[in-house]
Amino acid sequence: MAESWLRLCGAGPGEEAGPEGGMEEPDALDDSLTSLQWLQEFSILNAKAPTLPPGGTDPLGYHQVPGLVAPGSPLAADPACLGQPHTPGKPTSSCTSRSAPPGLQAPPPDDVDYATNPHVKPPYSYATLICMAMQASKATKITLSAIYKWITDNFCYFRHADPTWQNSIRHNLSLNKCFIKVPREKDEPGKGGFWRIDPQYAERLLSGAFKKRRLPPVHIHPAFARQAAQEPSTAPWGGPLTVNREAQQLLQEFEEATGEGGWGTGEGRLGHKRKQPLPKRVAKVLRPPSTLLLTQEEQGELEPLKGNFDWEAIFEAGALGEELSSLEGLELSPPLSPSSHGEVDLTVHGRHINCPATWGPPVEQATDSLDFDETFLATSFLQHPWDESSSGCLPPEPLFEAGDATLAADLQDWASVGAFL
C-alpha cells in the first residue's frame, strides 16, 4: 500500500526504502483523500460528446485524444485518467429529479370529485362559495354556521385544511358589498345574525364575475343626466353661447332687483357677451359699470363724445365764456430764470401792478439757507434731539402776527387785481 502511494506521489526508485532504511511506514493511510477514482463516477461522463456531421472537420482536435470528452472537463487535466475506458457512473445532483414549486401547481382536472378528494382545493373564490351555500339553502337568509357546514360537506379539502379559511369567509361577508346582514328578530331562537345576497349582484356572483372584488358601477342622478342632455356642448372658440332656463330666470330676477335694463337683449353684442353657460357665474356676477347698462339709444347719443371736443364753442357759450373773455387782456410775463433778480411785471390794460412781497424771495436768503444747512449737518450730532433746555425756539405770537400781516397784504393786492376784471 505504501509503495503504491509513493509511486503515485512521484517518488523515484532511489527514494524508496523499507523499514530497514530508516523510513517508517505510516500506520493508516486514508485512500479517500488521495484517490481520484471518484472522478470516474462524475456525471459529466454520462454526457454524450457532440457528433460531427459527415464530412465535418475537427479544428480543435477533440477526438484525437482517446477518452477526452471536452477540453474543459475535470478529466482533461488528469494524466491518470488518460486512456481509461469510460464507464457509466452513478447519477448525481445534476440528474436528480426536480419537483415543481408549491405555488406553481398544475390546474386540477375537470373530473376531480371535490367532495371526496382532500388534496385538491376547489377553484372557487370565497365569495362564490358563500353564494353557492346561500343558493343551496333555499332560504332568504342563512347563518354563518350554516355556511361553514355546507362548505365542509361539499368540499373535502376544507375539512382537512387549516381552519383559517373560516376567517376569510367572515371577512368576505363583512367587507363585500354583495352580502347584506339581516339582524335576528327578538322572537327568533339562536344567536347571531343572518346573511343574504343583494339581489342586484346575485346573477354576477353565480356567473363567476365576482371572483375578485370590483368597484360598484357609477350611477348618475337623473337630474344631472337631464341637465347634461339639455345643454349642448359648444367649443370654446366657435358658436354663440347658450343659456338654459334657470340662467334666464336668474337674469330676469337680477334685472328686476336692480331696475336697469340692457342685459336681456339677446340680439345686441353685449347680450351675447354677458350670457354664461353656468347659472352659478350669473348669480355671483358683480354689478356692471353704468356704461354697460345703457340702452342702444343712449349709447348712440354718447357716440359723438368719442370724437374731438369743440373747446371754442364750449368756452364761448354760457357764463363761463363771459368770465374767461375778460381775461384775454391780461398779459403775464414769462417766468423768471434762476439768475434774474428783477420783479414780476403784471400789466392789466396798460396799468402796472406791484408784485407782492412774498412772491420774490431774495437771493441772499437762499445762500444763507445753504450755509445754515451745512452748519446744521456738521453740528447736529453734538446736540441731543430732545433737548428741552434749549432756548432756540421762537414764541408763537410773533409768527402769527407776521402771518396775519402778510395775508392782509396779499388780499389787498388781489383786490386791486379783481377791480380791473
UniProtKB/Swiss-Prot annotation:
<dbReference type="GO" id="GO:0000976">
    <property type="term" value="F:transcription cis-regulatory region binding"/>
</dbReference>
<dbReference type="InterPro" id="IPR018122">
    <property type="entry name" value="TF_fork_head_CS_1"/>
</dbReference>
<dbReference type="GO" id="GO:0008104">
    <property type="term" value="P:protein localization"/>
</dbReference>
<dbReference type="GO" id="GO:0006959">
    <property type="term" value="P:humoral immune response"/>
</dbReference>
<dbReference type="Pfam" id="PF00250">
    <property type="entry name" value="Forkhead"/>
</dbReference>
<dbReference type="GO" id="GO:0007507">
    <property type="term" value="P:heart development"/>
</dbReference>
<feature type="DNA-binding region" description="Fork-head">
    <location>
        <begin position="120"/>
        <end position="210"/>
    </location>
</feature>
<dbReference type="GO" id="GO:0060429">
    <property type="term" value="P:epithelium development"/>
</dbReference>
<dbReference type="GO" id="GO:0072016">
    <property type="term" value="P:glomerular parietal epithelial cell development"/>
</dbReference>
<dbReference type="GO" id="GO:0000981">
    <property type="term" value="F:DNA-binding transcription factor activity, RNA polymerase II-specific"/>
</dbReference>
<dbReference type="GO" id="GO:0007283">
    <property type="term" value="P:spermatogenesis"/>
</dbReference>
<keyword id="KW-0238">DNA-binding</keyword>
<dbReference type="GO" id="GO:0035082">
    <property type="term" value="P:axoneme assembly"/>
</dbReference>
<feature type="compositionally biased region" description="Gly residues">
    <location>
        <begin position="259"/>
        <end position="268"/>
    </location>
</feature>
<dbReference type="GO" id="GO:0033085">
    <property type="term" value="P:negative regulation of T cell differentiation in thymus"/>
</dbReference>
<dbReference type="GO" id="GO:1901248">
    <property type="term" value="P:positive regulation of lung ciliated cell differentiation"/>
</dbReference>
<dbReference type="GO" id="GO:0005634">
    <property type="term" value="C:nucleus"/>
</dbReference>
<dbReference type="InterPro" id="IPR001766">
    <property type="entry name" value="Fork_head_dom"/>
</dbReference>
<dbReference type="GO" id="GO:0032715">
    <property type="term" value="P:negative regulation of interleukin-6 production"/>
</dbReference>
<dbReference type="InterPro" id="IPR036388">
    <property type="entry name" value="WH-like_DNA-bd_sf"/>
</dbReference>
<dbReference type="GO" id="GO:0050869">
    <property type="term" value="P:negative regulation of B cell activation"/>
</dbReference>
<dbReference type="GO" id="GO:0042130">
    <property type="term" value="P:negative regulation of T cell proliferation"/>
</dbReference>
<dbReference type="GO" id="GO:1990314">
    <property type="term" value="P:cellular response to insulin-like growth factor stimulus"/>
</dbReference>
<feature type="region of interest" description="Disordered">
    <location>
        <begin position="256"/>
        <end position="277"/>
    </location>
</feature>
<dbReference type="GO" id="GO:0044458">
    <property type="term" value="P:motile cilium assembly"/>
</dbReference>
<dbReference type="GO" id="GO:0030856">
    <property type="term" value="P:regulation of epithelial cell differentiation"/>
</dbReference>
<dbReference type="GO" id="GO:0032355">
    <property type="term" value="P:response to estradiol"/>
</dbReference>
<keyword id="KW-0539">Nucleus</keyword>
<dbReference type="InterPro" id="IPR030456">
    <property type="entry name" value="TF_fork_head_CS_2"/>
</dbReference>
<dbReference type="GO" id="GO:0060972">
    <property type="term" value="P:left/right pattern formation"/>
</dbReference>
<dbReference type="GO" id="GO:0035502">
    <property type="term" value="P:metanephric part of ureteric bud development"/>
</dbReference>
<feature type="compositionally biased region" description="Polar residues">
    <location>
        <begin position="90"/>
        <end position="99"/>
    </location>
</feature>
<dbReference type="GO" id="GO:0030036">
    <property type="term" value="P:actin cytoskeleton organization"/>
</dbReference>
<keyword id="KW-0805">Transcription regulation</keyword>
<dbReference type="GO" id="GO:1904612">
    <property type="term" value="P:response to 2,3,7,8-tetrachlorodibenzodioxine"/>
</dbReference>
<dbReference type="GO" id="GO:0000122">
    <property type="term" value="P:negative regulation of transcription by RNA polymerase II"/>
</dbReference>
<dbReference type="GO" id="GO:0060271">
    <property type="term" value="P:cilium assembly"/>
</dbReference>
<feature type="compositionally biased region" description="Gly residues">
    <location>
        <begin position="11"/>
        <end position="21"/>
    </location>
</feature>
<dbReference type="GO" id="GO:0045944">
    <property type="term" value="P:positive regulation of transcription by RNA polymerase II"/>
</dbReference>
<dbReference type="GO" id="GO:0007368">
    <property type="term" value="P:determination of left/right symmetry"/>
</dbReference>
<feature type="region of interest" description="Disordered">
    <location>
        <begin position="79"/>
        <end position="110"/>
    </location>
</feature>
<dbReference type="InterPro" id="IPR047512">
    <property type="entry name" value="FH_FOXJ1"/>
</dbReference>
